Regions:
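Noncatalytic regulatory segments and standalone regulatory/sensor domains
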Residues: 31, 35, 157-161, 168-236
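Active-site-adjacent substructure of cysteine-protease-like catalytic cores
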Residues: 120-188
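Bacterial N-terminal signal peptides
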Residues: 11-20
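Sec-dependent signal peptide cleavage junction
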Residues: 19-37
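Bacterial N-terminal signal peptides that target proteins for export
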Residues: 1-10
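Active-site nucleophile-adjacent alpha helix/oxyanion-hole segment immediately C-terminal to the catalytic cysteine
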Residues: 34-92
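Second-shell loop/turn segments in exported
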Residues: 48-60, 87-97, 109-117, 125, ...
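Solvent-exposed loop/turn segments at secondary-structure junctions
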Residues: 57-61, 68-69, 91-95, 114, ...
Length: 236
């Protein structure tokens, strides 16, 4: 059964910090024959939570940007903070990024109800999404270990969990071989998607103090139904 939240936006798929490059415009006939570089569409999802989709700046503000997306989704009419204000409030910095505890504390101090825990399973993740609850995940940013990280060998300090990244899981599609999950990724233009197997492999991170967060997620249980992606504010 399909369950959807809001109006879906056709979007692109990219992995953290990947940019899609295209050639300059050519003849109209040639353009019409080129297929968009999408790996899927949000309309394919069984469940999709439509949230504001914002871009991070720099290489360390992914957590801050995810928090801003959540706050704008929960209260779009009072979303007058910019990313710098969130960065200061969360204590985000280039060395540590935004630790999980800082995000949870910020939500609690701002009366946003959350459930934060480790060792979540993908069926539990799908269940949260089905209830209309987006989930912040700390993962490894890249799809392949060749991109500079490993999730197994803790003796290799240079690569072990070296590419931590925050994303928001906003939807899923149940397929014969498992789930496909959809994400707001602050390092990407548009939405992203990832297979259940790939997510399980990458769903782990470590903070600067050496604390490992395995299958950690911050489930937003507060109500975000007031957000309307097609709504327009009067420019006063």
């Amino acid at each position: 059964m399909e369950k959807r939240y809001g109006i879906l936006i056709l979007s692109t798929f990219a992995c953290a910090a990947c940019f899609l490059l295209s050639d300059c415009a050519g003849p109209a006939a040639e353009q019409s024959s080129v297929q968009p570089p999408y790996d899927g569409q949000t309309q394919d999802a069984d469940v999709f939570i439509d949230m504001p989709n914002l871009r991070q700046y720099g290489g360390y503000t992914c957590g801050t940007t995810c928090v801003q997306m959540v706050m704008n989704w929960l209260d779009p009419y009072q979303a007058d903070w910019n990313l710098t204000a969130y960065e200061e409030e969360l204590g985000t910095n280039e060395e540590a990024g935004t630790p999980p505890g800082s995000i949870v504390s910020f939500f609690e101090e701002n009366s946003v109800t959350v459930t934060a825990k480790e060792n979540r399973t993908t069926p539990e993740l799908a269940s949260a999404l089905y209830q209309g609850h987006p989930v912040l995940l700390c993962i490894q940013a890249w799809a392949a270990a060749e991109d500079g990280y490993n999730t197994q060998n803790s003796d290799d300090a240079d690569t072990y969990l070296a590419e931590g990244h925050w994303v928001i899981c906003v939807g899923y599609q149940k397929k014969e071989l498992g789930y496909v999950f959809y994400f707001n990724d602050p390092a990407c233009v548009g939405y992203c998607m990832m297979s259940e197997q790939d997510l399980n492999n990458r769903w782990i991170d470590m903070d600067t103090e050496g604390n490992v967060y395995d299958h950690y997620g911050i489930e937003i249980t507060a109500d975000g139904t007031s957000y309307n992606p097609d709504g327009v504010f009067y420019l006063e």
